[in-house]
Swiss-Prot record:
Species of provenance: Saccharomyces cerevisiae (strain ATCC 204508 / S288c)
Induction: In contrast to some bacterial and mammalian enzymes, MGT1 is not induced by alkylating agents.
Any single Pfam family the record assigns to this protein: DNA_binding_1
EC number: 2.1.1.63
GO molecular function: DNA binding; methylated-DNA-[protein]-cysteine S-methyltransferase activity
Catalytic activities: a 6-O-methyl-2'-deoxyguanosine in DNA + L-cysteinyl-[protein] = S-methyl-L-cysteinyl-[protein] + a 2'-deoxyguanosine in DNA; a 4-O-methyl-thymidine in DNA + L-cysteinyl-[protein] = a thymidine in DNA + S-methyl-L-cysteinyl-[protein]
Domain of life from the UniProt record: Eukaryota
Main location class: nucleus
List of residues binding DNA: 120-121, 134, 157
Function noted in UniProt: Involved in the cellular defense against the biological effects of O6-methylguanine (O6-MeG) and O4-methylthymine (O4-MeT) in DNA. Repairs the methylated nucleobase in DNA by stoichiometrically transferring the methyl group to a cysteine residue in the enzyme. This is a suicide reaction: the enzyme is irreversibly inactivated. Prefers double-stranded DNA over single-stranded DNA as substrate.
Name used for this protein in its record: Methylated-DNA--protein-cysteine methyltransferase
Other observations noted: Present with 150 molecules/cell in log phase YPD medium, but not detectable in stationary phase cells. This enzyme catalyzes only one turnover and therefore is not strictly catalytic. According to one definition, an enzyme is a biocatalyst that acts repeatedly and over many reaction cycles.
Family in the record: Belongs to the MGMT family.
High-level lineage: Eukaryota, Fungi, Dikarya, Ascomycota, Saccharomycotina
């Protein structure tokens, strides 16, 4: 069986983003950050090939008619520019891949609020695996829904920035933007 996925690329002052939507559900299934469109396309093609199931192949096509996905694309742009925290459900998404453990971690990351950080150990405790901080870190590194699953809000036990799939510099910028916007929103 073939399943159709559509991709598009957006650019912002912060960085670019490569977005992939599943036609069947119209949900976002992949969001990667960076400014090199061809590099990101190659990454997603490799990722899909690696994760093809025996009965499912993925056909990746450029999104030509964006109307169906327009609101999700606009909301992702707002999210990327950190203009404001988005309400839950503003961008419908789903985990197309991932182990049970990874999905458990990713679902817990959804509870980390805009403008806040927690440690890998905190997440491990929250999912009932208090000694699994490193495994939580690996699950964060496997996250393919940048920003929506906010792995950028997770820091080391010493509260310092640690690795980020899309660069520690970008992680720092995203956190600083969120912090500034949270302070601005609290003054309203």
């Amino acid at each position: 069986m073939k399943e159709l996925l559509y991709y598009t690329f957006i650019e912002t002052e912060v960085t670019g983003a490569f977005l992939v939507f599943r036609e069947k559900t119209q949900n976002l299934v992949f969001a990667s950050l960076g400014n090199d469109k061809l590099f990101l396309l190659g990454k997603v093609e490799g990722f899909l090939k690696k994760h093809e199931k025996q009965d499912t192949m993925y056909d990746l096509q450029e999104l030509k008619e964006a109307e169906t996905y327009k609101k999700s694309i606009e909301n992702y742009t707002i999210c990327l520019e950190n203009k404001m925290p988005l309400p839950s459900g503003a961008i419908p998404f789903e985990f197309l891949f991932g182990t049970d453990f990874q999905r458990k971690v990713w679902n817990e990351l959804l509870n980390v609020e805009h403008g806040h950080v927690v440690t890998y150990g905190d997440i491990a405790k929250r999912i009932g695996k208090p000694t699994a901080a490193r495994s939580v870190g690996r699950a964060c590194g496997s996250n393919n829904l940048a920003l929506l699953v906010p792995c950028h809000r997770i820091v080391g036990s010493n509260r310092k920035l640690t690795g980020y799939k899309w660069s520690c510099k970008l992680k720092e910028q995203l956190l600083n933007n969120e912090k500034e916007n949270s302070l601005s929103l609290s003054r309203l």
